[in-house]
Amino acid sequence: MAGSGMKSLAKDTAIYGLSSILGRVLNWFLMPLHISIFTNTIEYGKVSRIYGLTALFLVLLTYGLETGFFRFMNKKEENADKVYSTSLITIGCTSLLFILFSICFITPISEWLRYTDHREHIMIMAIVVALDAFMTIPFAYLRQQKRPKRFAALKLAFIFFNIFFNLFFLVFCPWIKEAYPDFILNKFYHQDIGIGYIFLANLISTLAVLILLIPTTMKGLKIDFDKSLLGRLLKYSFPLLMLGLAGVISQTVAQLVYPYIFDSVEEADRQLGIYSACVKFSVIISMFIQAFRYAYEPFFFGKNKDGKDNTKSYADAMKYFIIFVLLIFLVVMFYIDIIQYIMHRIGRNYAIGLDVLPYAMMGEIFFGIYFNLSVWYKLTDKTKYGAYFSILGCVIQVVMNIVLVPIYGYIASAWATFACNLIIAAISYFIGQKYFPIKYDLKNIFLYFVLATVFYIAAMYPQIDNELLRMGYRTLFLIAFAAIVIKKDLPLSEIPIINRYFKRYK
């Protein structure tokens, strides 16, 4: 692994990744809990739809300001305290306005979203998304100040709160109601609220983290709003809103369009419930991308600040990123029998959708590549290209879903995500080489993709009835791929944590 910069990036990725991976894994366990309790796929489809809308509005309410915050905090000519204060005040005001707007227009909003039976679900999550948007700047401040442990602790606190209150409302309270009918708690618990308790648990957890976050990031904060600075921030950040929309649509396009392309909302929610539950298994790719992103943005902005040519570091980061995501892809697909067993045990009605998984994971991989490539227009302040790519991606996603989902079903959503991210990544690469040339190791990157594809086909194609023999056969290909990677580009003595053992036995 080349250079001290890569070791620093790997170390930060490991710290952020620990919280991201642990948090995502813990949060993932809510999916089995939910589908085992709400066996009707329509109910889980409603949950998925609301969270898809929440993700979309979170991007809209942060309007790219998180990345703009990093950019301006690293500019020598800008006052860091003023950047923080201006960003915080701006996003706080827009979040408050969003809550007030949602309260005043909840009826037409729920009708427009085709979610009229439980408007309170929308209202609860409107408050949640506004609070989440406000907290993006304090969390970004922790990253900027190189406080990954505090950042990780607060992120994990939310996960633990959320899991606790989900278990409290969905498991403990029903058990108390059945075992002890006269218990005082039963007066406040109403089982017919159903999935509403999922959203209520989220709201309580968000408020708890906000209370913990404020003393850490706002102690001694000077209120200093600079209108001129805000204009520069928005000019830089607003095009990144489109980039953010591309990312969120890549993950939530089904939740956004299904209610409008099926004959009934119930059928849309049924298909969405199956699709969403199975796509959750691609979380291992997305959480690695998230961990990498947390470390990579401060890394490349910080590198750019020192005025040196760091394109070699960016190229190395891309190659190692691709190596790891391909390894993750092969691990998940080679042991998909375990996933199938889990799904049949906890949610038989959902298991039929697992055929979406390879396409969903490849879609995530190419979105990660696209994020890596975005370094060229972020560092050259040509963020308008991010907007162009995002608009193109949105069009591809929406058109493919509208045209193909009614014919082929939910699997077409996974195809659309894969195709969209592949296309915009390719276009970004070719345009980026014109404005900010980076010599990526295309030869080895292409080789690893070919090897992964060949090994995947060779491992998955033979029909081996015995499960242990089947997984053992596939494991041989996984070992072979890992051995090639280690031999060519990833000596074990250079990997953080593992390298300690090599030093010990030298």
Predicted features, each with a name:
Residues 2, 461-506:
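Membrane-proximal transmembrane or re-entrant/amphipathic helices at the cytosolic face
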Residues 61-77, 278, 282-319, 374-379:
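Helix-loop junctions and terminal segments of transmembrane helices
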